[in-house]
Amino acid sequence: MSKTLTDPELQTALGSLHGWAKNGIAIERKYEFKDFLEAMKFVNKVADAAEAAGHHPDIQIVYSRVTLQLTSHDSGGVTHRDIKMAGRLNEIHP
């Protein structure tokens, strides 16, 4: 189990993660695409990255909008693992 980040640690980490913000015990980013098909192409890339990392975001899809949330459930909050995964997801769609 990883140690959850303190609020100052989390704020520092979020400063380098475009689009991500704290939401409760998670970090979240919202994406907007031109249509449903583009949103699903992105979600499929997210799924591939998540499987490779062994760390899976919560995903909400509403037509062309995708919301991703990352938290380490076993730690009860955001850990370095979530920050690393958010960085990887930003590589897929900056």
UniProtKB/Swiss-Prot annotation:
Example of a GO MF term: 4-alpha-hydroxytetrahydrobiopterin dehydratase activity
Superkingdom, natural source: Bacteria
InterPro entries linked to this entry: PCD_sf, Pterin_deHydtase
UniProt xrefs under CDD domains: PCD_DCoH
Catalyses which reaction(s): (4aS,6R)-4a-hydroxy-L-erythro-5,6,7,8-tetrahydrobiopterin = (6R)-L-erythro-6,7-dihydrobiopterin + H2O
Keywords: Lyase
UniProt family annotation: Belongs to the pterin-4-alpha-carbinolamine dehydratase family.
PANTHER family with a match to the protein in the record: PTERIN-4-ALPHA-CARBINOLAMINE DEHYDRATASE
Protein name per the record: Putative pterin-4-alpha-carbinolamine dehydratase
Taxonomic classification: Bacteria, Pseudomonadati, Acidobacteriota, Terriglobia, Terriglobales
